[in-house]
Amino acid sequence: MPWIQLKLNTTGNQAESLGDVLVESGAVSVTFQDTHDNPVFEPLPGETRLWGDTDVIGLYDAETDMADVVAMLECHPQIGKGFIHKIEQLEDKDWEREWMDNFHPMRFGERLWICPSWRDVPDPTAVNVMLDPGLAFGTGTHPTTALCLQWLDSLDLNGKTLIDFGCGSGILAIAALKLGAARAIGIDIDPQAIQASRDNAQRNGVSERLELYLAKDQPAELSADVVVANILAGPLRELALLISVLPTTGGHLGLSGVLATQAAGVAQAYEDKFILDPVAEKEEWCRITGIKK
C-alpha cells in the first residue's frame, strides 16, 4: 500500500520528543535522519545520540488527512503555527524485495566471500561465509569490516586461535574459522551480539569451534595467535593495555573502527608492544596491524 511521509527539522535534543508527537498524530513509524548526511558513531552503552540538526520523518497511512495532522501539530506547544515541513506521497513498492536486491555477495582478498542466504554463491570452491544483513552488526558492507576481512584473508590461519574483541555479528571470528583457524573466541559487551554471533556460527557450521563471552565474563589470561578488534578509536586507546596482552609473542594484532585522522593516536597506544605495519586505508577509515614483540 502507498504511504504519506511528513518531514520536519529540529535539533538532536528535541528529536525524540518530536517523534513522540508524530506518533500521537497518527504516524505508524518515525525515523531520524541527519539533515547534512553526517555519520553518528557508535554511542556508549545506554546512550542515544542524534545529530545536532535532525530531520524527523513520520510515515502515515495513505488515507490519512494530512491537513488534520498539520492542524494538530500546529496546536502543539513544541511545534506551533507555520512550522516548516514537507509532505510527499511514497511510491508503493515491495520494500522487502527492494531491500534484499541491494545486497550481493562480496569478495574480500583472494579467497573469502560474504554471501546473503538468498543469493547464489559465486564460487563454490572459495571460502564462503553465509551472513544476512541486519540492523545492528557488521556484514562486510562497512569499510572497517572490509579492511579486517581482507587482512584475515591475507594471513595463514591454519590451526591458529583468534580472538575477536567486540565481535558484533561474529563475522570476523566466523571468517577466521572458515579460513582455517582451529578455534575462535568472540567477546562483546552486548548480549544481542553474543546471540547474533551464536546464530551466525551455527548457520556456517562452525559453532563447535567458537567460544563466546560477555566482556564481564571473559576468562582471565586469554591469549591467541591472532587478535582483531573492530570497535572505535576511543575504546581502542582506553583498552590498549587489556588488548595488548591478548596476542602471543609473535602473534598478529588487527585494529579498526578508526578514522584515518585518528590512526596516529591509536597506533601510539600500541607501538611499545607491537611492530606496527603501515596503516591501511579505505575511504575515510583505516586499519592498524602489527606483530607482538
Curated annotation (Swiss-Prot):
Reactions it catalyzes: L-lysyl-[protein] + 3 S-adenosyl-L-methionine = N(6),N(6),N(6)-trimethyl-L-lysyl-[protein] + 3 S-adenosyl-L-homocysteine + 3 H(+)
InterPro entries: Ribosomal_L11_MeTrfase_PrmA (IPR050078), Ribosomal_PrmA_MeTrfase (IPR004498), SAM-dependent_MTases_sf (IPR029063)
SUPFAM superfamilies to which the protein is assigned, alphabetical: S-adenosyl-L-methionine-dependent methyltransferases
Primary site of residence: cytoplasm
UniProt keywords, alphabetically: Cytoplasm, Methyltransferase, S-adenosyl-L-methionine, Transferase
EC number: 2.1.1.-
Gene Ontology biological process terms, A to Z: methylation
Pfam families reported in the protein's UniProt record: PrmA
Keyword Cytoplasm included in the entry's annotation: yes
Amino-acid positions noted as binding S-adenosyl-L-methionine in the UniProt annotation, renumbered to this chain: T145, G166, D188, N230
GO cellular component terms given for this protein: cytosol
Location in the cell: Cytoplasm
Paired cysteines (S-S): none
Enzyme class: transferase
Molecular function via GO: protein-lysine N-methyltransferase activity
Record's function text: Methylates ribosomal protein L11.
UniProt family annotation: Belongs to the methyltransferase superfamily. PrmA family.
The protein, known as: Ribosomal protein L11 methyltransferase
Organism: Yersinia pseudotuberculosis serotype IB (strain PB1/+)
Gene coding for it: prmA
